[in-house]
Amino acid sequence: MSAPIVHGGGITEAAARYGGRPEDWLDLSTGINPCPVALPAVPERAWHRLPDRQTVDDARSAAADYYRTNGVLPLPVPGTQSVIQLLPRLAPANRHVAIFGPTYGEYARVLEAAGFAVDRVADADALTAEHGLVIVVNPNNPTGRALAPAELLAIAARQKASGGLLLVDEAFGDLEPQLSVAGHASGQGNLIVFRSFGKFFGLAGLRLGFVVATEPVLASFADWLGPWAVSGPALTISKALMQGDTKAIAAGILERRAGLDAALDGAGLNRIGGTGLFVLVEHPRAALLQERLCEAHILTRKFDYAPTWLRVGLAPDAAGDRRLADALARMEL
């Protein structure tokens, strides 16, 4: 098995290395809404009992409306990482996997560990009939690159002709619903869409995601995960929040993103990509920049495969923006 990937987060470890209390650090290392929404009331029975069929069906129905799946009832899963781990069972055997990259590293790690030949490709021109599974994160993490639905559906059609699959990870898609292909999964036949619940709502600890695909694919994932894969409280919370008005959540995220942009621009940093939930910065001394920010007890995300890149997430408030701006202003790199 390959070595684990170092992801965002890890405030406790950072504090142990650079000092300070974890609660005093400013965590800008993730792509998670830093202003979690207020939790709806969860009935005691959701904690006391195993989730029943009605609870699951209600959450799936709410997800179908929220993700505009055109009749498909999305499968709730305990975080999309849980189904990434299952992809070696789904990917056509003895064929290559193509991953549009650079992107979220767990796809390549899991599939290569299972013995698949993984080709990292820049665009659809690199795809061949050898690719049994094509993976696109859209919008992409960490670059923010976005493919239009027409481009993705063209790839899906090409894959279908060669007996292959297309997986589109829309983990950061809540703020850009016009990019989603979730509504095409039932008609396309070979299209699978992953959606993340926790990033937009600021509830990553809930460990909840959804899969949109044909019924046979959903049945396979459900069988591999086993019964009661998602907790009753998670299902109850997701139903309530997806049925609520999310406009204020989106507006709050965009306001926080504007504050981050201002702090980075004020320091003269080069923004080269991102989504509503993070910015990708290019700097010739990105590793040193990350180190200096850690010394100021501000955590960001660097990338071993791209030493000039730094991903910066959103601060929870204007005070966090000022703290970042002040730390950058004091730096000599």
Swiss-Prot record:
Entry superkingdom: Bacteria
Pathway: Cofactor biosynthesis; adenosylcobalamin biosynthesis
Entry cofactors: pyridoxal 5'-phosphate
InterPro entries documented for this protein: Aminotransferase_I/II_large, CobD, NHTrfase_class1_PyrdxlP-BS, PyrdxlP-dep_Trfase, PyrdxlP-dep_Trfase_major, PyrdxlP-dep_Trfase_small
List of residues that carry N6-(pyridoxal phosphate)lysine: 199
Enzyme class: lyase
GO cellular component term of the entry, any: cytoplasm
GO MF annotation: an example: threonine-phosphate decarboxylase activity
CDD domains: AAT_like (cd00609)
Protein's GO biological process: cobalamin biosynthetic process
Quaternary state and interactors: Homodimer.
Function: Decarboxylates L-threonine-O-3-phosphate to yield (R)-1-amino-2-propanol O-2-phosphate, the precursor for the linkage between the nucleotide loop and the corrin ring in cobalamin.
NCBIfam families: L_thr_O3P_dcar (TIGR01140)
Protein name (database record): Threonine-phosphate decarboxylase
